[in-house]
C-alpha cells in the first residue's frame, strides 16, 4: 500500500511564532526543520494518497546510485561489512520526500552495486529518540558483535547518544535491532556543552590503555569540537577532559569521522586493531555545507589529534568533495582490506520538485579512500565493484585536441556512462601564472574563467549531458597554472548551463591540486554520469566533484551527447580514452519489506 506523501509549505518564522503562508484544510502535521543543505523550514503534513508522480520521478532517478525506492534520505549511517554482507544504514523518512520523521533505513548487498532494501533498523519509539533517530556509527566489538551508537532527540529536541544491538546475530541480514534499556548512554550534561548541538558519534577505536574511544560532534564553550569519550564496555562512557580536537573559527562540526591511513598505501586500517608505525590519521568534519578534513597524528600520550598543518582560515581546509556532498561516513572493509567512504548528495532543485518526484537525496558511489604518498591529502576512487555494471566499451587512442576542438564520444549511453580519459600536455611552458588568493574561493575562479575562456594550458576536459544545440550542457575540465617551482591544476564542474530551468542551483564547482608536471605530463579524469548525478575524479582522485543536474534532455532517450574538448592555447594529446554504458543496478527495488 502506498505511503501517504507529505506536503512542504514554506513558513514564516517570527520570534517563537510560526505563520503558514497557505494551509489547506486537510493539512495537519508537525514543524520540520531545515534539511542541512540550507533550505528553509517547512510544515510536514499529510497529502492525499495515491497521487501520481510527475515524469521527473523517473527522468531524474539514477540507475546505479544508492537511493531508496521513494521518499527522503540523507546521511549514510553506520556502514559495515559483517559475515559476508555489506550493510548501509541511512537517514530516512518513511512518510514522504521531505526532511522529517527520521528513522534508520537499512539495505544489504554482496557487491556494493546491487542493494536489497529491508525494514528500517531503528524507528522513533522511545523517549530518547522520539524526535528522530539521527546519524551514528557501527563498531564491531570483540567476538564479532556489531553495535550501533546513534544520536536520538527527545521531545524538547535535546540530543543524546543511544545504543542498539542485533536481536539475532545468526540472521545474515541483521534485520532486527534492540535498543539498550539504559538509553541514552551519553548526555551533554557537563558545563559548556550545548544540548542541541551534540550528535553523530564516530566508530569506536581502542586506545593503548585498552579502553574504547569515540568522538561526538558538538560545541564546547562556543568552540566547534570533536568531543572525546572513553569506555570499558562500550555501554558506559566517560567524557575525557579535553576534546579530540577543537577549533574556534568554525560552526558546529557534524558527522565527524576519524580513521588511520598509511602514506602511499591504499590498504585500509582497522581502528580496533594495532595501528602500524608511520601511520597518519584523518579527522573529517561536516561544516559549512561541505565535508572538510585534516591530516595529522594521533598523539597517544595526549589522547588528542594533532594536525600536521594548523590552518586557521577554514576556507583553506582540504575537502573530501568539492561539490554537492555532505555527511560522509567511512568504514573499514575487511573483505578487501580497504577503507570505503560515501556521502549524501542532496537535491538542488526545489522542495516542490521533490514532492513531485516522490523522492529526494542519494548516496555517492562508494569510494576507496587512502593517503597520498606525500602524506598531504586523501585520494579517492570508485570501488572496483562498480565496474561490473560496465558494458559496450569503446576506445580511442592517439587523439590530438587543438584549440577549439570538440571530439564526440559516440556509441555509449550518454545518460548512464563511465568515461576515463587521460590528457597529456605537449608543453608546460605556456601555463598561466597562479594567484594564491584563488585558493580561498576556487568556485568563484571557475565561474569567472569558464570553459569558453582560453588560457595558456586549458580549459580541456569533457562536455556531458549536452543537447543537440548545446543549449544544455555540463562541463568538467582542467586549467593548469604555474606557481613558483610547482604547478597547480584547477578542476571545475560548471553547471551554469546544465539546464534551461531557471529554478535550480547551478554553480560552478571547483578545487585545486598540486601536480608534478615535470615528472608526469598526463592528467587523468574519470566521470560517472548517472542521469541527475555526476561524479568526477581528477588527477587520480586528488579532486572529486559531485554534481546534481536536471537537464530537459533527459526526457528524450538518445538525445544527449558527450564530448572531449580543448579551448586552451596549448595542444593536448589524448593517448587513451575509454567509455562504457552503465547498466542499471538493482537498488532498493520496492517489493515490500519481505523482499528477502
From Swiss-Prot:
A molecular function (GO) held by this record is: fructan beta-(2,1)-fructosidase activity
The record's SMART domains line, in alphabetical order, gives:
Glyco_32
Please name the InterPro entries in this protein's record. Answer: ConA-like_dom_sf (IPR013320), Fructan_Metab_Enzymes (IPR050551), Glyco_hydro_32 (IPR001362), Glyco_hydro_32_C (IPR013189), Glyco_hydro_32_N (IPR013148), Glyco_hydro_beta-prop_sf (IPR023296)
Identify the keywords attached in UniProt to this record, alphabetized: Disulfide bond, Glycoprotein, Glycosidase, Hydrolase, Signal
Summary of activators and inhibitors of this protein = Inhibited by sucrose.
> What EC number(s) is this enzyme filed under?
3.2.1.153
Q: In which tissues is it expressed?
A: Expressed in the stem, particularly the penultimate internode. Little expression is detected in roots and in the peduncle part of the stem.
- Report the temperature dependence from the record: Optimum temperature is 25-40 degrees Celsius.
The relationship between pH and activity is given as: Optimum pH is 5-6.
Q: Which residues form the active site?
A: 75
Q: Spell out where the chain is glycosylated.
A: 168, 236, 248
Name of the top EC class for this enzyme: hydrolase
List GO BP terms, alphabetically: carbohydrate metabolic process
Matching CDD domains, A to Z? GH32_Fruct1-like
Disulfide linkages recorded for this protein, renumbered to the chain, are 446-492
From the UniProt annotation, give the residues forming the signal peptide.
1-20
Quote the catalytic activity from the record. Answer: Hydrolysis of terminal, non-reducing (2->1)-linked beta-D-fructofuranose residues in fructans
Q: Which domain of life is it from?
A: Eukaryota
Function according to Swiss-Prot or TrEMBL: Hydrolyzes inulin-type beta-(2,1)-fructans and beta-(2,1)-linkages in branched fructans. Has low activity against beta-(2,6)-linked fructans. May play a role as a beta-(2,1)-trimmer during graminan biosynthesis.
Task: Give the record's family classification.
Answer: Belongs to the glycosyl hydrolase 32 family.
Q: What is this protein called?
A: Fructan 1-exohydrolase w3
Q: Which organism is it from?
A: Triticum aestivum (Wheat)
Report which gene this protein is encoded by.
1-FEHw3
Amino acid at each position: 500500500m502506498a505511503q501517504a506523501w507529505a506536503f512542504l509549505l514554506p513558513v514564516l518564522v517570527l520570534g517563537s511564532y510560526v505563520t503558514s503562508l497557505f494551509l489547506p484544510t486537510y493539512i495537519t502535521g508537525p514543524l520540520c526543520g531545515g534539511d542541512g543543505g540550507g533550505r528553509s523550514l517547512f510544515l510536514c503534513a499529510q497529502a492525499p494518497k495515491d497521487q501520481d508522480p510527475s515524469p521527473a520521478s523517473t527522468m531524474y532517478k539514477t540507475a546505479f546510485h544508492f537511493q531508496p525506492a521513494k521518499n527522503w534520505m540523507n546521511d549514510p549511517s553506520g556502514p559495515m561489512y559483517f559475515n559476508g554482507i555489506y550493510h548501509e544504514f541511512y537517514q530516512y523518512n518513511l512518510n514522504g520526500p521531505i526532511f522529517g520523521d527520521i528513522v534508520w533505513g537499512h539495505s544489504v548487498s554482496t557487491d556494493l552495486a546491487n542493494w536489497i532494501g529491508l525494514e528500517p533498523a531503528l524507528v522513533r519509539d522511545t523517549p530518547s529518540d522520539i524526535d528522530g533517530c539521527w546519524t551514528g556509527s557501527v563498531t564491531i566489538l570483540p567476538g564479532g558483535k556489531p553495535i550501533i551508537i546513534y544520536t536520538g532527540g527527545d521531545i524538547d529536541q535535546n540530543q543524546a547518544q543511544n545504543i542498539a544491538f542485533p536481536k539475532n546475530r545468526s540472521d545474515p541480514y541483521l534485520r532486527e535491532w534492540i535498543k539498550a534499556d539504559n538509553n541514552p548512554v551519553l548526555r551533554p550534561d557537563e558545563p559548556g556543552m550545548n544540548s542541541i548541538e551534540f550528535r553523530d558519534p564516530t566508530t569506536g577505536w581502542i586506545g593503548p590503555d585498552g579502553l574504547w574511544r569515540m568522538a561526538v560532534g558538538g560545541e564546547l564553550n562556543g568552540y566547534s569540537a570533536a568531543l572525546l569519550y572513553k569506555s570499558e564496555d562500550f555501554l558506559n562512557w566517560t567524557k575525557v577532559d579535553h576534546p579530540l580536537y577543537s577549533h574556534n573559527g568554525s560552526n558546529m562540526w557534524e558527522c565527524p569521522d576519524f580513521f588511520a591511513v598509511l602514506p602511499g598505501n591504499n590498504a585500509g586500517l582497522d581502528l580496533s586493531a594495532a595501528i602500524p608505525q608511520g601511520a597518519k590519521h584523518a579527522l573529517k568534519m561536516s561544516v559549512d555545507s561541505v565535508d572538510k578534513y585534516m591530516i595529522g597524528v594521533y598523539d597517544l600520550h595526549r589522547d588528542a589529534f594533532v594536525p600536521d598543518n594548523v590552518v586557521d582560515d577554514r576556507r583553506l581546509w582540504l575537502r573530501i568533495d568539492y561539490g554537492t556532498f555532505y555527511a560522509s561516513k567511512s568504514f573499514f572493509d575487511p573483505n578487501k582490506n580497504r577503507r570505503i567512504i560515501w556521502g549524501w548528495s542532496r537535491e538542488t532543485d526545489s522542495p516542490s520538485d521533490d514532492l513531485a518526484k516522490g523522492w529526494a537525496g542519494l548516496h555517492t558511489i562508494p569510494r576507496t579512500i587512502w593517503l597520498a604518498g606525500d602524506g598531504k591529502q586523501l585520494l579517492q576512487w570508485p570501488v572496483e565493484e562498480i565496474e561490473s555494471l560496465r558494458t559496450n566499451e569503446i576506445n580511442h587512442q592517439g587523439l590530438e585536441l587543438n584549440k577549439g576542438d570538440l571530439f564526440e564520444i559516440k556509441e555509449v549511453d550518454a545518460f548512464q556512462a563511465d568515461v576515463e580519459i587521460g590528457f597529456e600536455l605537449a608543453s608546460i611552458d605556456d601555463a598561466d601564472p597562479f594567484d594564491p588568493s584563488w585558493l580561498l574561493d576556487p568556485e568563484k575562479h571557475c565561474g569567472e574563467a569558464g570553459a569558453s575562456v582560453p588560457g595558456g594550458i586549458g580549459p580541456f576536459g569533457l562536455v556531458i549531458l549536452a543537447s543537440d544545440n548545446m543549449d544544455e550542457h555540463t562541463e568538467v575540465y582542467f586549467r593548469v597554472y604555474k606557481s613558483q617551482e610547482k604547478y597547480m591544476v584547477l578542476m571545475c564542474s560548471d553547471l551554469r548551463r546544465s539546464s534551461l530551468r531557471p529554478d535550480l542551483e547551478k554553480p560552478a564547482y571547483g578545487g585545486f591540486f598540486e601536480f608534478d608536471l615535470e615528472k608526469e605530463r598526463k592528467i587523468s579524469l574519470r566521470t560517472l554520469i548517472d542521469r541527475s548525478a555526476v561524479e568526477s575524479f581528477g588527477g587520480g582522485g586528488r579532486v572529486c566533484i559531485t554534481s546534481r543536474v536536471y537537464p530537459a534532455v533527459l526526457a528524450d532517450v538518445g538525445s544527449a551527447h558527450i564530448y572531449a574538448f580543448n579551448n586552451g592555447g596549448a595542444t593536448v594529446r589524448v593517448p587513451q580514452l575509454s567509455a562504457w554504458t552503465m547498466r542499471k543496478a538493482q537498488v532498493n527495488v520496492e517489493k515490500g519489506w519481505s523482499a528477502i
